[in-house]
Amino acid sequence: MEVEKPVYDFEGIEFCQTHPVFDGARWRMVRNHTAVLNKDPLILVDIPNANVHQRWMNGVGKCGLAIANGLPVQQELYSLFVRESAGKTCKDSFLLYIMKNTSRMIQSKNLAPRTTPVSISARVSYYAAFGILPDRQIAIEEHYKNFHLLRLDVTPISHAQVGTVRAGHSIPSFEH
């Protein structure tokens, strides 16, 4: 059995790669900042063309917005995915396919994807949970507002060949 070091701040608790974050109205278990950045842009299904890629971005973005609305950094990252989907929507059957065996699918069930203003309380709590200062959170969000993901023009493409960001670039994590 592994025994972890004690924590003295509520946000320091880690359970299943999540930390509690107060969003200004309630406490929520929020996925680790680094896990979101490392896992969510990763495509694990075959993407045969640009249309499917845009639908994939829409599905990831909408699931993310359903569970991360009002949260620093993460809300803007998922908004980027939805924005870059160019209006292509993700049908429920495809959403089930791309989110199979993920906790995100369960967490986002019956939740509407939306954006809400990020409160000061959420920024402070996110800092306590993940160590990213509020001014840095805002800088990351501004970067995501102006960032563009790769639009695939080639066909076919498989998950073995995929990168969701522009060639030679990656989604910055802005780690502390």
Annotated model-derived regions:
Residues 1-9:
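A generic structural motif
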Residues 8-176:
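Active-site and adjacent loop segments of nucleotide-processing enzymes
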